[in-house]
């Protein structure tokens, strides 16, 4: 039922049955404060995300450790603005602040190294061996990994003598994790989150409500939180924004939503 309702609101359809389903997931401020610590708050405002994460991190007694992203330019002729724009498009932090005991979320898929985008865990150790740094993370599934920095490459396809080749313009190295207490809806795209609270205050972009709700892996551990002084159903309907062209596309085409299919599996 959850995935069926998600599919419908993605197309801009809403009726009393769908509204009743999502209203049953609503929690108030008191209920939010009583939730387990392993829930992730998803909201649209970066300032609120930072405030939540900073507050939770400050309550840990272990020392603060900072990791600065390392940027490597392959050519001095590369436009600095272009590089910075590219780095901002990556789901990493320029300065990553962590403590032992902090709950973190992985921001990329790296199946070979044993983690995926949206998976979570607790930091158990930070170790330094020669010129390498490792972060020991106990994942929620009980498996511990020693995380190394992830290297992202800025590439362009170029042609030389009728041959195409990939030219690396720059690279950036950073641990592909963030604090998992709160994340913006925008930065959560592609993630699959086990225990999720969707703060739907200040939803303002087309499709943003769908993106937030569809991050949930398990509808049984999905909560919806908002603080507006209006009826939940009226507010939910008011933020279900979509493009008419999107609805027409779904009406005229048959397709599989691979993201929802993967979550169901």
Model-predicted segments: where are they?
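Conserved helicase motor core of P-loop NTPases
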Residues: 1-113
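C-terminal accessory regions
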Residues: 100-265
């Amino acid at each position: 039922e959850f995935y069926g309702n998600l599919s419908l609101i993605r197309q801009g359809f809403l009726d009393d049955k769908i509204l009743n389903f999502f209203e049953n997931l609503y929690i108030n401020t008191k209920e939010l404060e009583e939730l387990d610590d392993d829930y992730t708050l998803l909201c649209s405002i970066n300032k609120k995300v930072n405030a939540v994460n900073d507050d939770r991190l400050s309550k840990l007694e272990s020392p603060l450790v900072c990791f600065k992203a390392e940027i490597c330019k392959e050519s001095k002729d590369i436009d600095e603005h272009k590089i910075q724009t590219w780095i901002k498009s990556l789901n990493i932090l320029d300065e990553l602040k962590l403590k032992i005991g902090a709950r973190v979320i992985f921001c990329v898929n790296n199946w070979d190294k044993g983690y995926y985008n949206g998976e979570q865990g607790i930091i158990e150790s930070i170790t330094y061996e020669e010129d390498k740094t490792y972060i020991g993370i106990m994942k929620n599934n009980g498996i511990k990994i020693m995380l190394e920095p992830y290297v992202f490459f800025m590439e362009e396809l170029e042609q030389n003598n009728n041959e195409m080749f990939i030219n690396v313009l720059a690279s950036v190295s950073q641990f592909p994790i963030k604090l998992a207490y709160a994340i913006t809806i925008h930065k959560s795209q592609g993630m699959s989150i086990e225990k999720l609270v969707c703060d739907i205050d200040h939803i303002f972009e087309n499709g943003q409500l769908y993106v937030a709700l569809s991050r949930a892996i398990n509808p049984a551990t999905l909560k919806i939180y908002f603080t507006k002084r209006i009826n939940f159903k009226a507010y939910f309907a008011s933020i279900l924004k979509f493009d008419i062209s999107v609805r027409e596309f779904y009406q005229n085409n048959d397709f599989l939503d691979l993201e929802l299919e993967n979550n169901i599996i």
